Amino acid sequence: MGRGKIEIKRIENSTNRQVTFSKRRGGLLKKANELAVLCDARVGVVIFSSTGKMFEYCSPACSLRELIEQYQHATNSHFEEINHDQQILLEMTRMKNEMEKLETGIRRYTGDDLSSLTLDDVSDLEQQLEYSVSKVRARKHQLLNQQLDNLRRKEQILEDQNTFLYRMINENQQAALTGEVKLGEMAPLAMLQPPPAFAHSATAYYGGESSSSGTALQLMSAAPQLHADDLGFRLQPTQPNLQDPAAPCGGLHGHGLQL
């Protein structure tokens, strides 16, 4: 049973279409090579795929350029030569005209060139300017609101810092006052120590360390009731031997002692 005839139409499946292109291209180039070799013909083939990739074949006896020149000579056709200088001149002229139009539009927007405008043109220009001004004002208000928000945030930050510093200062002041109160409470304790002259006189009177220790304790216990300025009062002794003013130790540096 022979092969069925394939319908010649575009293959919808891209994979099948690519596979068929590769097979048919290989077969075509093979047939072109056989024709050139067997018949000594000048054959040239140029193929572009659907993706734009180029494939070419030329018979071994010549090059593809030679075949194209031979084709042009045989058909009396020539490719149009491109004049690059003229193209550049045309492009420069076009750009110059465009720049003149832009400059004219700018002068009209600034109000410098309105003499050539009609009433309708002036009305259109006025509407365009009003629309532009409204957009500029909207952008201005947006920027002002952003700046105000930034200033409010900075103000809040400064207030928080100020509150924190104020609290720290108050805490330091309270701590300093507490320290002063504690020092004030400890100050009277220093007054409990007897004056050096007083303690020395008591020790000398009782004639020894053993007897002076008790007397010194009694004097120290009585010290809070005495003021430093009241040490000049005269104390009278209660012992008979101390009541005699002629006694050898009748007083302590001119003062009597009453126990």
Curated annotation (Swiss-Prot):
It comes from Zea mays (Maize). GO terms for molecular function: DNA-binding transcription factor activity, RNA polymerase II-specific; protein dimerization activity; RNA polymerase II cis-regulatory region sequence-specific DNA binding. Residues 237-259 are annotated as: Disordered. Keywords: DNA-binding, Nucleus, Transcription, Transcription regulation. Residues 85-175 form the K-box domain. One of its GO terms (cellular component) is nucleus. InterPro entries: MADS-box/MEF2_TF, MEF2-like_N, TF_Kbox, TF_MADSbox, TF_MADSbox_sf. Pfam families: K-box, SRF-TF. PROSITE patterns: K_BOX, MADS_BOX_1, MADS_BOX_2. It is found in: Nucleus. Residues 1-61 form the MADS-box domain. GO terms for biological process: positive regulation of transcription by RNA polymerase II; regulation of transcription by RNA polymerase II. Strong expression in female inflorescences (ears), but also weak expression in male inflorescences (tassels). At early stages of the development of the female spiklet, expressed in all organ primordia but later restricted to the ovule and the developing silk. At very late stages of development, expression becomes restricted to parts of the silk. Probable transcription factor. This is MADS-box protein ZMM17.
